[in-house]
């Protein structure tokens, strides 16, 4: 028992040291790191979506839900960069964190479903989904620290309920179709997150808006 408590204490101290170290890093550097991570997230989700697109049968495309049915669609977000540039830093951070948090459970469903997906690249897809989860967790931790530096408004998170399930389809076509749809929604949102963080990075570096 004492050994377990010692290990637990060491882990707690390690986490505290990591948080303290990150808290001492200038906000510009933290935004650079977050922007790099969000870029990786969007790039990986884009690659995954393309991999799946080649194997969705014609009937699958007719069955696929439209983007407005993504579970995050109720969140009011800028439609383009010009609109994003009109928002405050706190609003942009709040939107990015809300979108990222809304994907915690859906990414678990994607990971579980990837293990039984009938696809030539099933193993690769499964590994990449796990990478998405790791990058999302890492980015989320970073944004928690950043929002803490920016104040209460940046820490506000909008609730975006996800009503999915572990089983995203009864047969291979419906599973592949729903898997692709869910991943497409994530790709769309990862692009938004990446765009918001790039605007924040530009502002922190005092770069002209048109250069963002």
From Swiss-Prot:
- Keyword tags: Disulfide bond, Hormone, Secreted, Signal
Compartments, as annotated in UniProt: Secreted
One GO BP on record is:
response to nutrient levels
Position of the signal peptide: 1-24
The Gene Ontology terms for molecular function here are: hormone activity
Superkingdom of this entry's organism? Eukaryota
Gene Ontology CC entries for this record? extracellular space
Disulfide bonding pattern of the chain:
70-185, 202-212
Identify the InterPro entries for this entry: 4_helix_cytokine-like_core, Somatotropin/Prolactin, Somatotropin_CS
Predominant location: secreted
Family, similarity comment? Belongs to the somatotropin/prolactin family.
Write down what this protein is called. Prolactin
